[in-house]
């Protein structure tokens, strides 16, 4: 397991990804609603969607050996080693606007994205 601290990034060593306060707070709320403090948010990339890859979000109680973890505001984010390579430098956020509310990934590695925002290619 690889852990990513909540330390600020330096110019020489950028953080591998950003888990915003807004996203962490929403996940914390959802975990409280589930009533299981052992839940962690797993973010992953899988084949599919109209652009070749798509993002997925699920709750998981287990941390796998190849997972990278990040703790923010008491919430643990998990990313497996295969997905990690596609998410390096990405920002995982939660947005609420007139169109609704959703988790959003801003990924600098994506060369194209689908209109739905959940599918991308590299």
UniProtKB/Swiss-Prot annotation:
The lineage of its organism: Bacteria, Pseudomonadati, Pseudomonadota, Betaproteobacteria, Burkholderiales. The keyword Calcium does not apply. GO terms for molecular function: 2 iron, 2 sulfur cluster binding; 4 iron, 4 sulfur cluster binding; iron ion binding. It comes from Cupriavidus metallidurans (strain ATCC 43123 / DSM 2839 / NBRC 102507 / CH34). Iron-sulfur cluster binds at residues 50, 114, 116. Binds 1 iron-sulfur cluster per subunit. Coiled coil: none annotated. Its cofactor is iron-sulfur cluster. Required for insertion of 4Fe-4S clusters. Belongs to the HesB/IscA family. Pfam families: Fe-S_biosyn. InterPro entries: FeS_biogenesis, FeS_cluster_insertion, FeS_cluster_insertion_CS, FeS_cluster_insertion_RrpA, HesB-like_dom_sf. GO terms for biological process: iron-sulfur cluster assembly. HAMAP family: Fe_S_insert_ErpA (MF_01380). This is Putative iron-sulfur cluster insertion protein ErpA. The keyword Iron applies. Signal peptide: none annotated. Homodimer. Keywords: Iron, Iron-sulfur, Metal-binding. The gene is erpA.
């Amino acid at each position: 397991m690889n852990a990513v601290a909540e330390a600020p990034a330096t110019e020489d060593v950028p953080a591998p990804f950003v888990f915003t306060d807004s996203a962490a707070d929403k996940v914390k709320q959802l975990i409280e609603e589930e009533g299981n403090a052992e839940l962690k948010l797993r973010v992953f990339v899988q084949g599919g969607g109209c652009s070749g890859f798509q993002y997925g979000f699920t709750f998981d109680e287990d941390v796998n050996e190849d997972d990278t973890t990040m703790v923010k505001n008491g919430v643990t984010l998990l990313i497996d080693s295969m997905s990690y390579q596609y998410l390096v430098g990405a920002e995982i956020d939660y947005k609420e606007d007139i169109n609704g509310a959703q988790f959003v990934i801003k990924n600098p590695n994506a060369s194209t994205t689908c209109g739905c925002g959940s599918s991308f290619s590299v």
